[in-house]
Amino acid sequence: DDERLIEKSGYFREKWYLRNYPEAAGSGLAPARHYLQEGWKKGFRPSMQFDYEFYLNTYPEVNEAGICPLVHYEREGRRKGYFPNARQLYKSIWKQNRAGFADRLKFWAAKLGLPGVKKPAYLSLAAIIKNEAPYIREWVCFYYLNGVEKFYLYDNESEDNLREVLSDFVSAGIVEIINCPGKAKQVPAYNDALSRLRYKTQWLMIVDADEFMIVNGNKKISEFLKDYEKYAALAVNWVMYDYGGLLKKPEGLVLENYRTVHGKFHPKNLHVKSVINPRKVALCVNPHYCEYKGGNYAVNENFEKVVGPVTAVQSIDKIRLNHYYCKSYEEYEAKVARGLADSYFKYTIKKEDYAFDDATEDYVAGRFAGPVRSLMEKGV
């Protein structure tokens, strides 16, 4: 199946492949079969049009999964809006960056303090969600208390009571829920938010509903960002939490229930998510990585340049992104099952994903539980 798939893809060029990799011609294998069995593992490109290194560097989950890049692109990447080469990426960037003159004028007029012009939000948040009602109120309350003024939630066919759970935030104009049906909509949703909000917010945070960004100290996120305004983005490292020995979904808040994390040097902790200045961002390429406009770049908490979706080391002395990937074992099982419906590739339960061998205690999020619970109960 995969052999026929890549032959029909338009990105496997048999003559080009044989000309550039003579060992394939002498292998006794059909060119496509050689690429699938041996070539891609050696870093061979299927054609000039499909850039092997670009694809793996831009979408690190492909490398982690050990999947042939071209097969991944045809089975999953294409419908997710992934790019097979840098040329197509930059073509999309050009199309994305044509904001209307009126929006630009309003933004800069507000920045100058001209009368009668609504001031843009300082910090907004965009996320795509599906069936997150049991957790979403805690998450929204947490970020609202930490300086997020406006939430743009892309609802990917939720079947729960999302709008009811957030009704007070919606009525107050703090949360806007945007219908976003279909599969593989994460990156398209982020780019829609980038286009919508380029001149409506100073900063745009792009995170998932299981991620909580925490400043170490007394500052809100919005206050912490003041020192980074000359940069295109602040890239924040993950801190990965496991199930903490909980087999069933517990009572209480996510912030207080989970207290064990991967050790500092685990590669999962090297991934970043970013708070971006949307006027300096050309395109969201994947959930962990944006392309920036002419000379602009992201930095970490120490003002060190960050290139790509991962960092060389985890840096979380000032700010971190707690990632409650699995929660309890019961919830992890349900998450794996949900993932199957949105992917050609089979995801299975792996003990190392929910019970970390290198787990250490970490409870920095606990201090937020009281204020968050209070806001959840009283509302806005």
Language-model features: locations:
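Short beta-strand-to-loop acidic/aromatic patch adjacent to the donor-nucleotide binding site
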Residues: 201-214
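Acidic donor-binding segment of Leloir-type glycosyltransferases
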Residues: 141-179
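N-proximal low-complexity "stem/linker" segments adjacent to membrane-targeting elements
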Residues: 88-141
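Charge-rich, low-complexity intrinsically disordered regions
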Residues: 1-111
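Catalytic-site signature of metal-activated, phosphate-bearing donor transferases
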Residues: 188-190, 215-380
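A short, glycine-/small-residue-rich helix N-cap motif at loop->alpha-helix starts
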Residues: 182-188
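Short acidic donor-binding/metal-coordinating loop in glycosyltransferase active sites
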Residues: 156, 181-182, 208-209, 217
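Active-site nucleotide-sugar/metal-binding loop of Leloir-type enzymes
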Residues: 191-203
